[in-house]
């Protein structure tokens, strides 16, 4: 029984299957954790969703910003951009089933026995774990309700960017969504910066990567995240695992076997012929 953590798949179905074959992943015996952004940019978003859904209890995933953007496109709120290569998924006969399943997936995964937490972008240092749990449930409840299109229409935006327990309504939900799915840099007090996408070495002062600012969750738990391909899986403190290594940009798909902390990589099948960018500013 092994636990495998894999970074952002982004529609790279062939690489995902090859990587799982490489590690001899066995559904029903092993567990697969996925950092989100299952879809967009790669050619196989439809196949990725079908496969991941078929794994049932053998998979634990979190939603990423591209997954939320797909839901917004499906709801008629956002435009389907050709570069995201989502049309086969949106036009599939089982699109309703797949996307209604997707919107019921969590923003946060926690394994208390392993002392392991996963979120797509990470955990803001302004939150303790109880706050993170409550905030995740707030957005998950709206996404799984009939009013989810209203939330998806309001989720786009960069403010508010500072956490307060007094936040209410759509502002609260937008902050939570940004913290879980778009965060990279923070100010020293933990306030989110939603504009900088550089590598940590190139970021303007006083910005720091979220994981470089002490927070209560990282004191007690390991944190696995994706989202930040330009990190190339490097430069994080002990106990912080950056797993997005840019497969859809011509990099690799990375897997971490949790029990012995061994890494496995699968090279991308694609040439790096696209400039890096995102369907949702992240």
Curated annotation (Swiss-Prot):
Q: Which SUPFAM superfamilies is this protein grouped with?
A: Metallo-dependent phosphatases
Keyword terms of this UniProt record: Hydrolase
- UniProt-listed Enzyme Commission number(s): 3.6.1.41
Does this entry carry the keyword Hydrolase? yes
Gene Ontology MF annotations: bis(5'-nucleosyl)-tetraphosphatase (symmetrical) activity
By its UniProt entry, which InterPro entries does this protein fall under?
ApaH, Calcineurin-like_PHP_ApaH, Metallo-depent_PP-like
A single Pfam family, by name? Metallophos
Protein's UniProt keywords contain Kinase: no
Q: Which reaction does it catalyse?
A: P(1),P(4)-bis(5'-adenosyl) tetraphosphate + H2O = 2 ADP + 2 H(+)
Kind of enzyme, top EC level? hydrolase
Its function, per the record, reads: Hydrolyzes diadenosine 5',5'''-P1,P4-tetraphosphate to yield ADP.
> Which HAMAP family does the entry link to?
ApaH (MF_00199)
**Family to which this protein belongs:** Belongs to the Ap4A hydrolase family.
Q: What is this protein called?
A: Bis(5'-nucleosyl)-tetraphosphatase, symmetrical
Native species: Escherichia fergusonii (strain ATCC 35469 / DSM 13698 / CCUG 18766 / IAM 14443 / JCM 21226 / LMG 7866 / NBRC 102419 / NCTC 12128 / CDC 0568-73)
Q: What gene name is given for the protein in this entry?
A: apaH
């Amino acid at each position: 029984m092994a636990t495998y953590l894999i970074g952002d798949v982004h529609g790279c179905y062939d690489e995902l299957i090859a990587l799982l074959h490489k590690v001899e992943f066995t559904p029903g015996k092993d567990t697969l954790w996925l950092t989100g952004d299952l879809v967009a940019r790669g050619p196989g978003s439809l196949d990725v969703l079908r496969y991941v859904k078929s794994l049932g209890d053998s998979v634990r995933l979190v939603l990423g910003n591209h997954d939320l953007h797909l839901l917004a496109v499906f709801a008629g709120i956002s435009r389907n951009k050709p570069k995201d290569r989502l049309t086969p998924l949106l036009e599939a006969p089982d699109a309703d089933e797949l996307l209604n399943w997707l919107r019921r997936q969590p923003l946060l995964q926690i394994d208390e026995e392993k002392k392991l937490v996963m979120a797509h972008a990470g955990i803001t240092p302004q939150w303790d774990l109880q706050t993170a749990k409550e905030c995740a449930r707030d957005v998950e409840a709206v996404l799984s309700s009939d009013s989810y299109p209203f939330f998806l229409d309001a989720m786009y935006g960069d403010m508010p960017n500072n956490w307060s327990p007094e936040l209410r309504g759509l502002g609260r939900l937008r902050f939570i969504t940004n913290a879980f799915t778009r965060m990279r840099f923070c100010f020293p007090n933990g306030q989110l910066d939603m504009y900088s996408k550089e590598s940590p070495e190139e970021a303007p002062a006083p910005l720091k990567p979220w994981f470089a600012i002490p927070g209560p969750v990282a004191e007690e738990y390991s944190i696995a995240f994706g989202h930040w391909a330009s990190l190339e899986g490097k430069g994080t403190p002990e106990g912080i695992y950056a797993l997005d290594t840019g497969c859809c940009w011509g990099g690799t798909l990375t897997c971490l076997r949790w029990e012995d902390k061994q890494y496995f990589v699968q090279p991308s099948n694609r040439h790096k012929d696209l400039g890096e960018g995102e369907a949702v500013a992240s």
